[in-house]
């Protein structure tokens, strides 16, 4: 069975930096899948020029479209035309054809993976159109945040240089997320994010406040609590 490293090995034109970038991408792309409520596929062309699924990412926030392992699968011939067009694009490329995966109607969007002036492959965002019906504020904010991260891929801005997944016990989208303005003001906080801050002792509302100031309030509250705790002499 083909795996990620073996598939990349079919491309001798990829240098170490190219491979490292792709490994970094699949280490960090879970957040995009979760925010977007969508499956992600990384496609690269193998030594024969065929588009192959090099890696896949299932969302943890919605039922996956891909219960089976599709790594190593060759993309069908009827998709080659739009895949070639997406590879030549400098921005996100949207398919004009709805496809069927299982029993779901799916819209494909392609993000060319750009790095050091080269297009290494495509990240396919497979969206089940049924998940776009009757979305509320939470879903809309989540999808928009995922879209912004996804659109950074062709610009070479995602993944970040410093890995997001390097920490142990990393929080996931389902634990809550916060949307900030360019100035660092909270524009939206997911319900679970608000609950986390409440448990830490935050009493004010979050939207409209600088996140840094909210954090400072919590630090001051913790410091005050420590100062007022009775001290026990060591025996």
Q: What is each residue range found by the language model?
A:
Residues 39, 109-110, 176:
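Conserved beta-strand and immediately adjacent loop positions that scaffold enzyme active sites
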Residues 40, 201-205, 233:
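Secondary-structure boundary/capping signal
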Residues 1-77, 89, 98-101:
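Non-catalytic regulatory/interaction regions at protein termini and inter-domain linkers
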Residues 2-36, 129-176, 220-224:
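PAS-family sensory modules
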Residues 78-141, 195-196, 200-212, 217-227:
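Sensory/regulatory domains in signal-transduction proteins
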Residues 226-235:
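Single conserved hydrophobic/aromatic residue that forms the stacking wall/gate
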Residues 45-81, 141-146, 159, 165-227:
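PAS-family sensory domains
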Residues 42, 112-113, 179:
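Hydrophobic beta-strand positions
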